[in-house]
Amino acid sequence: MMEYFYRIYGLRVQSQIPFSEAVPETAGEAEVKIGFGRMPDVLLEAGQKGYGTWTNGFVSAWFRIRDGTQVYVEGGSRITVELSEEPQLLVITSLLLSAGMALVCLQRGEPFFHGSALYTGEQAILLCGESGAGKSTVAMELLQRKLGFLADDTVRVHPGTMGMLAEPSYPQQKLCRDMALKCGKPLEELIYIDEERDKYAWRRQDCYRKEAALLGKIFLLRKDAVAGWQDAVQNTGEEAVSIQKLTGQKALETLSSQLYLADTYRYSTGIPYPLMKQLVRIAGQAGI
């Protein structure tokens, strides 16, 4: 069977599934392997009963895609895929690059955040926040102001010789229809990837940075009804913006809340000590 090599989130990935959106890599010893196979027997009943996810702490995890395809991630180094009878390949590859690789990194004890990563020319900045907070809107505006593109939606952070680094993911940005139209990109030049969520993909080789960057700032975006803001809106017709620097326990709580699968791990297994150490290093290095 054909084997493909890619550089994804800074890791050499060997895969039996092609990823047209990823950066090709020379063949060599892989840090992550993606291949076809059967699910472990212990998970057969879960799939038959209609369950969608299962985790075994930070050791292994399983999830089922809406087309019936199943994915098993173990040891921070292997992803096994069992295709359904009618696989939706664009959805499968998208989830392998997000959820699949997120589980790999968390199992490796590395922080993996929800958010976008951009490059200022000197350092990486992360844009985090809940769905609807404006991450994509702010990221698109900054990209139009000539910042570099590192990652869209999910970001791997890990220790480097000079400090904590944000790794590039792959040169593709996901857009909803409204955002694509707002930035003036013709829809026919984009790739339609998700009918249910009306999502498009934009290949961003034009501004993609292939090397990791030292993490500088993390911005948590949110929409709040804060006392005094309503008056500003009524008086000026514009929304007021407030910024606050977080330190200490609040900074750590904020970082942990932005981890991929944060709620699952906070309320079941808890965040393991090695991963918490990485969060402490990030809080000490980056302004939040």
Residue ranges and their predicted role:
Residues 56, 93-94, 248:
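Generic structural signal for well-ordered secondary structure
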Residues 37, 106, 148:
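Short, solvent-exposed cationic patches
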Residues 62-69, 73-123, 184:
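Extreme N-terminal, non-catalytic leader segments
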Residues 1-88, 280-288:
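Long, basic/Gly/Ser/Thr-rich N-terminal segments
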Residues 2-18, 22-23, 120-130, 144-288:
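Glycine-rich, often acidic-flanked micro-motifs
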Residues 135:
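Conserved lysine of the Walker
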